[in-house]
Amino acid sequence: MQLFHLCLIISCTCPTVQASKLCLGWLWGMDIDPYKEFGATVELLSFLPSDFFPSVRDLLDTASALYREALESPEHCSPHHTALRQAILCWGELMTLATWVGNNLEDPASRDLVVNYVNTNVGLKIRQLLWFHISCLTFGRETVLEYLVSFGVWIRTPPAYRPPNAPILSTLPETTVVRRRDRGRSPRRRTPSPRRRRSPSPRRRRSQSRESQC
């Protein structure tokens, strides 16, 4: 099994393999995007630079601190929890493979090639997966998708026509909450005013209020 994983990774270092395709998906003739069922795409995640994502160690510590009980639970919590479990297990297997390669592959050049590929290409994909699902659990999926779209628009806009700073994910939920509150309060402020002007007596107020409720 370890030899199969080794051949799998080495075969994926071929420059003809598109970066947007998962390695197993390419081998079986399938174009698999792990973000599609969540409303995003690999291309949408690719707008974020590689140094944007924290290290795998930091992301694993965050997932453990926030969602360890749910991740270790035998029950199904959400699709994001399930995806997090799979990503964490996948990274553990990759670390086992890297250790095996370091101990058993005699050719230093081949060993460095495999280890570098795991740390850069595969490591980046794991960092993206972990960040996406942790962020969706923390801020909400719609907020994360809105952020990805906003960042994609910002990064593709020429510097002369865009704000100097990129959008920040943690500020989007505050803006969204304010918008929802304003929308919810506006009808409440407008509806009482005409009733007070039109009803000169308390009896009319009661009758009109009953009619409005019906």
UniProtKB/Swiss-Prot annotation:
One record GO biological process: microtubule-dependent intracellular transport of viral material towards nucleus
Residues making up the propeptide: 186-214
Region (Disordered): 165-214
Coarse class of the protein's main subcellular location: secreted
Residue segments, region 3 X 8 AA repeats of S-P-R-R-R-R-S-[PQ]: 186-208
Domain of life: Viruses
Protein name per its UniProtKB record: External core antigen
High-level lineage: Viruses, Riboviria, Pararnavirae, Artverviricota, Revtraviricetes
Gene name of the record: C
